[in-house]
Amino acid sequence: MHPIRSVLIVTKPGHPTALDLAQDIGVWLTRRGVSCRILEGPGEALPLRQLAADAGLVLVLGGDGTMLGVARRLAGTGVPLLGINLGRVGFLAEVPAGEWAATLERLLAAPLRVERRLALRFGVERGGVEIFQGDAVNDVVINRGALARVITLDIDVDGERLAGLRADGLIISTPTGATGYAVSARGPLMDPALDAFTVTPICPFLGNFPPLVLGGGSVCSVRIREQGTEVHATIDGQEGIALRSGDRITLTGLRDGLCFATLGGGGYCARLRACGFVRDHACTLPDMLPDEGGTSTDV
């Protein structure tokens, strides 16, 4: 990509530290000939998309939650994002707050490199009419309301019936979201570069539905068969839709829907270790090779 000439900074709303840091970064960028605009909180999708259209980079100051909100509103625009971590986990917002200057210096010194990932695009249909459409960065979760009851769902893939499912819920996740709710439900970890998404049940009745990986171009349709129980769809853990019996949610991959600036540091495995998703238990195995006398070592 071309060198960065303009930056849009989006801060976590109601976070004075983020706003102060944004002002410091804005001054730093201006002194280097980069135009800068600061926005407190992502707000509505349309104004954010309009502001981001003129930016070579969107810098997000906050935690992974703030990154999710901004990335979801900018899904499909192709505008690269970079997160400065002011939160806890920092899997999406990967730049430590104390390293922002060195990081930006590196980004300005060479053409920007980006990593494109799959997002989810979904629609909710009621009575044959689409009542909602949206995108998801991490996942769409279909689950019960306040009462501890299983729900019944009908699942089709590419127009073909897959199964009826009785479970606490269902998680449809992108590779980016595989380290979120899905992994807690024993879904697989996925390389973010994969053109695929997962369908993972939450506590399936009798355990008769293993996690499923679908190609990014597949269409997964979920019909709510439950009556008399509250059912909701939650998008990235941040937005919710109340569902009724007979409603149908249709989901598919949005290729290149997410765009992140890359720093060329540690890879995916390093991030998994750093964030505690895998543990490296070093051990020394006994020598199993035959000794000079032709006998093997007993263990």
UniProtKB/Swiss-Prot annotation:
Residues reported in the UniProt entry to bind NAD(+): 64-65, 138-139, 149, 166, 168, 179-184, 238
Top-level lineage group: Bacteria
Cofactors, names only: a divalent metal cation
Keywords: ATP-binding, Cytoplasm, Kinase, NAD, NADP, Nucleotide-binding, Transferase
Classification via Gene3D superfamilies: Probable inorganic polyphosphate/atp-NAD kinase, domain 1, Probable inorganic polyphosphate/atp-NAD kinase, domain 2
Enzyme Commission code(s) on record: 2.7.1.23
Biological processes, Gene Ontology terms: NAD metabolic process; NADP biosynthetic process
Principal localisation: cytoplasm
A GO term, aspect molecular function: ATP binding
Residues annotated as the enzyme's active site: 64 (proton acceptor)
Catalysed transformations (reactions): NAD(+) + ATP = ADP + NADP(+) + H(+)
Entries under InterPro entries matching the protein: ATP-NAD_kinase_N, ATP-NAD_kinase_PpnK-typ_C, NAD/diacylglycerol_kinase_sf, NADK
Assigned GO CC terms: cytoplasm
Family: Belongs to the NAD kinase family.
Cited function: Involved in the regulation of the intracellular balance of NAD and NADP, and is a key enzyme in the biosynthesis of NADP. Catalyzes specifically the phosphorylation on 2'-hydroxyl of the adenosine moiety of NAD to yield NADP.
Protein name per Swiss-Prot or TrEMBL: NAD kinase
Organism name: Nitratidesulfovibrio vulgaris (strain ATCC 29579 / DSM 644 / CCUG 34227 / NCIMB 8303 / VKM B-1760 / Hildenborough) (Desulfovibrio vulgaris)
Organism placement in taxonomy: Bacteria, Pseudomonadati, Thermodesulfobacteriota, Desulfovibrionia, Desulfovibrionales
